[in-house]
């Protein structure tokens, strides 16, 4: 059974409700995202999470800035959606923060070599996600072709994302990935989680 990360958690009530139900809870710090939180709100969100592992998620923040914010708020993992240099990993390590690099899929991307390269970096996990601007849909509404996900799922600590919902999660779970990562698929509205959908997701992947 895969581990589960619920991303885009933007309020304390959802963070508390999810705590312990899933392994990872993601807080997005990205102005362009409808699920973004403000830096000053991270402390309260972090305090609501006692059992799960919180993750700071960003794309546009300079990596060192993201690591500093995570360290200051006792958030142990930074998931960064831009290309990272070796010194970014070194700096994160010096601050006691783990890094989750991201392999972004766009139509035509050779996904496996990209994932294999990221797996050679010091990583909490490697996330495979679709480009946020992509409108492409594949099996079950997934944003990445299932055949490509099947290629990368067994390579290591690979987390799969991109249009996963309770309805299509069994397709992804059959690939036996290290983790699945879901945001909009378990929402009532952007940044507001629907706990019935969360439970349906967990049931769909054999967790309940």
UniProtKB/Swiss-Prot annotation:
A GO BP annotation: L-tryptophan biosynthetic process
Superkingdom of source: Archaea
A GO term, aspect molecular function: phosphoribosylanthranilate isomerase activity
UniProt keyword annotations, A-Z: Amino-acid biosynthesis, Aromatic amino acid biosynthesis, Isomerase, Tryptophan biosynthesis
Keyword Amino-acid biosynthesis annotated: yes
HAMAP family: PRAI
Protein's name in the database: N-(5'-phosphoribosyl)anthranilate isomerase
Family: Belongs to the TrpF family.
Catalytic activity field: N-(5-phospho-beta-D-ribosyl)anthranilate = 1-(2-carboxyphenylamino)-1-deoxy-D-ribulose 5-phosphate
Metabolic or biological pathway, per its Swiss-Prot or TrEMBL entry: Amino-acid biosynthesis; L-tryptophan biosynthesis; L-tryptophan from chorismate: step 3/5
Enzyme Commission no: 5.3.1.24
InterPro entries linked to this entry: Aldolase_TIM (IPR013785), PRAI_dom (IPR001240), RibuloseP-bd_barrel (IPR011060), TrpF_fam (IPR044643)
């Amino acid at each position: 059974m895969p581990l589960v990360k619920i991303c885009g958690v933007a309020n304390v009530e959802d963070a508390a409700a999810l705590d312990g139900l899933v392994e990872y809870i993601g807080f997005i710090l990205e102005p362009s995202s409808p699920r973004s939180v403000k830096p000053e709100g991270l402390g309260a969100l972090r305090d609501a999470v006692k059992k799960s592992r919180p993750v700071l998620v960003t794309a546009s923040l300079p990596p060192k800035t993201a690591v500093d914010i995570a360290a200051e708020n006792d958030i142990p993992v930074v998931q960064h959606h831009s290309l990272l240099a070796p010194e970014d990993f070194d700096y994160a390590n010096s601050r006691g923060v783990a890094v989750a690099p991201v392999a972004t899929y766009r139509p035509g991307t050779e996904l496996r070599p990209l994932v294999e390269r990221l797996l050679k970096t010091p990583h909490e996990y490697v996330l495979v996600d679709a480009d946020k601007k992509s409108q492409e849909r594949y099996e079950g509404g997934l944003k990445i072709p299932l055949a490509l996900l099947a290629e990368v799922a067994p390579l290591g600590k690979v987390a799969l994302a991109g249009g996963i919902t309770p309805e299509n999660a069994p397709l992804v779970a059959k690939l036996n990935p290290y983790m699945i990562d879901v945001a909009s698929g378990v929402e009532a509205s952007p940044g507001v989680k629907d706990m019935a959908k969360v439970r349906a997701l967990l049931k769909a992947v054999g967790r309940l």
